[in-house]
Amino acid sequence: MKILIPFILTLFYSCEDKSTNSDTIFDYTMHKNNRVASLKMNDSDYDAWVNEDGFAINEDRLRVVNDLYNVFEDKYDFIFFVLNEPSIPENLLYYGRLVGVSNSVQGLGFQSYDNSLQYGSDGKLKAVMQLTGLEYLKYGPALHELAHQWANFALPTHSVNAPGEDLTSYLYTGHWGFTGGSIPGQLGGFRQNSLIENGNNSYTVESFGPFANGGNGVPYNEFELYLMGMLDIESVSDFDMFTNITSWSTNESTYDFTANQRTTYTSSSLVELLGSRIPSHINSQKRFELLVIVLTKESLSDEQWDIVDAHAEWFSKEESDGTSLYNFWEATGGVGSLNIGY
């Protein structure tokens, strides 16, 4: 009996513990603080996931997410995969990537869609994201990728590959490119009130990124917040979008560019173009459930657990930490919030 009783107790505990992996392809471990978890692949699966970008392969991504739902409840709006890598692997070409799963919001510039059943979710899951370094939840591009759930599908923005003369700009899907905003946006663009008109379609603005503006070091701008359902359209300041860009030069703190087409957007012209956002900022969802999973081929060390758990706590905190980085609550001006945990 002295041997049998511990055996029975252990068996009972294991049957109740979702981390036992009895019905899963991969091995799952939960952190003691119930915020983050790890998904352990064998060496060949993990190496293929990283070297062949398994996240971008629909079949591979669906396999992993469906397996998750054998362990975790279908209550999450977003699932974040975080690679257990010190920095972006050389085989991957992105710091973060979001794949939309479902979106029923109207007025964003696209038709609603719902592929959640393919992932094992009954309409709850909105998107899955991969961050290619262990610390990218805190330092970015976590905010940037979240913005892609709502933007940019609204405006036909333009960009160019590099500074130069006699350039031909191109449609810049998903980002703001050479577009102004209340501040430089998470998805790129310049500060509108820095715009100087030089004449002959020549302009000067504060330096900016057409693609992004510094990881989690900037909050969302007004138009981004509107698209996310966090701000009234009337609170979005007028801004300009420049296309047909033919030259771009960089100075110490400013950029000069020439663009043959300038389109000014106002709150009324945006509604005319996109239709009203439904649901509006009044009754839109502002609190989201987020699952953070570290993908790894080795068991996480105590230090690695501490890093990702602390970053998850910080990213979901509903207060300012007084640093130059923005968590989700800060980036939305205290309107939006995240719950990370299981």
Each predicted region: which residue ranges?
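Sec-dependent N-terminal signal peptides
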Residues: 3-12
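Bacterial Sec-dependent N-terminal signal peptides
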Residues: 12-30
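Short, solvent-exposed loop/turn and secondary-structure capping segments
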Residues: 90-98, 151-154, 160-162, 239-243
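Zn2+-dependent metallopeptidase catalytic core
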Residues: 24-139, 146, 254-342
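Active-site recognition of the HExxH zinc-binding catalytic motif
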Residues: 136-160
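Sec/Tat-exported extracytoplasmic proteins
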Residues: 72, 150, 154, 231-232
